[in-house]
Design a protein with these regions (language model features):
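Short amphipathic alpha-helical elements of helix-turn-helix/winged-helix folds
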Residues: 6, 23-28, 40
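Non-DNA-binding regulatory cores of transcription-related proteins
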Residues: 62-141
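Short, Lys/Arg-enriched N-terminal segment that forms or immediately precedes the first helix
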Residues: 1-11
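Basic amphipathic alpha-helical segments that dock to polyanions
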Residues: 53-63
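DNA-recognition alpha helix
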Residues: 36-45
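Short capping segments at the starts of secondary-structure elements
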Residues: 14-16, 28-33
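Pre-recognition alpha-helix immediately N-terminal to the DNA-recognition helix
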Residues: 19-24, 36
Length: 141
């Protein structure tokens, strides 16, 4: 799905800046922060402000077009993949990896639904040291 269509599908009025931000999120699966998106797009969009990037990413998250990740206490990151999945944050290199959701996630969601609840969000975060940093024997002190 193109970014323009995705915005419409989530009741977000498309603008040049919103399309650019959605496109960036969809093309860069790196879980970027507001600063990452702003730094990448501002050279080609001189009128883009960091506030616009923040407000747009927040709107995309609120409308279900993106996920807001609060796995890192210092940054908020965003993910265009809104399917049920987990995230792993490497405490050394700060890379965020996508992972399969725990097998119990769907089971728990079904149980809550059977009890009359409506689940709107589930977040599964893991933190540790990634295999690349372990390979390089990098330690957190």
């Amino acid at each position: 799905m193109e970014s323009y269509d995705r915005l419409l599908a989530h009741n977000v009025k498309p603008s040049m800046q919103r399309i650019a931000i959605m496109t960036y999120l969809m093309e860069h699966r790196t879980h970027p922060s507001v600063d990452d998106v702003y730094t990448a797009l501002s050279p080609s969009m001189p009128t883009l402000s960091k506030t616009t990037v923040y407000n747009t990413l927040r709107l995309l998250s609120e409308q279900g077009a993106a996920q807001m990740l609060t796995i890192d206490e210092r940054n908020v990151n965003f993910d265009a993949d809104t399917s049920l999945h987990a995230h792993f944050l490497c405490r050394k290199c700060q890379h965020i990896y996508d992972m399969d959701a725990p097998l119990s996630a769907t089971k728990q969601e079904n149980k809550l639904a059977a009890e009359g609840h409506q689940v709107e969000e589930m977040h599964y975060y893991y933190k540790g040291i990634c295999k690349n940093c372990l390979k390089e024997n990098i330690r957190i002190d």
